[in-house]
Amino acid sequence: MSKTITELEIGFSVLKVPILGWQIGNGTEVIHFYGGVHGDEPEGVELALKLKDFLMKNSGMFSDKSLMVVPVVNPDGYSAKTRVNARGVDLNRNFPTKDWSAEATQARYYPGPKPNSEPEVQAIVKLIGRREKIPKKIISFHSLIPRQINYDGPAKELAEAMAQYNGYPVTGNIGYPTPGSLGSYAGKEKNIAVVTYELPEKISIQEAWKQSSEAIFEAIQFDN
């Protein structure tokens, strides 16, 4: 493996499955890409894996950046094809935010017994907080009807720049409350540019890459 590519165990799931990340490049600007926060959204995992493979084969393409790709944040949910982790927690409601709430409108949104209770969330919180490796941007791949590029924190212009390449609608509100979300934690409270990139459900990886690759490259190079 190249000196500019490092495979990391950033943590473990509830069932002790390693959560793997790949750091590509040693540049000063740090950018994170996540897939599989929700295990029943395989389209985002496939896109993150495709991106990881592309960047590893073209590691000099963005030599001034430090890119971290975590394709499967929720490996237990991904294996079980469930939104939640092995304890039934929606990881995107478990981040330690000021707006965290113990209430859930449906079981699929269960936020856990307390904020940051889940090992998968703890791994991402630790990764985001690494000294001298704090990301300037975070792109989290999901899948939803309708497709959209949702933003939190100082990411509106970034989202709009990405949308120029595929026409995905840009939204500042996903349409329903998301207390304890990654966007609230990293975007609104940590002032990191966070994009939740929502692919159409059941899209093939070939079509997802066709629609998304240039938008992703723009996100990497965009100066926000």
Segments from the language model and where they lie:
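Conserved beta-strand scaffold positions in the cores of enzyme catalytic domains, especially
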Residues: 7, 21, 69, 138, ...
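Active-site/substrate-binding loop(s) of hydrolase catalytic cores
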Residues: 28, 42-50, 56-175, 192
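Short glycine- and acidic-rich boundary segments immediately preceding or forming the N-terminal edge
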Residues: 1-22
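Proline/glycine-enriched tight loop/beta-turn segments at coil->beta junctions
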Residues: 24-30
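Second-shell loop/turn segments in exported
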Residues: 37-38, 108-114, 198, 202-205
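Active-site beta->alpha N-cap acidic-glycine motif
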Residues: 16, 38, 56
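Active-site histidine-acidic residue metal-binding/catalytic motifs
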Residues: 33-40, 44
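Active-site-adjacent mobile loop/cap segments within catalytic or ligand-binding domains
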Residues: 148-150, 176-224
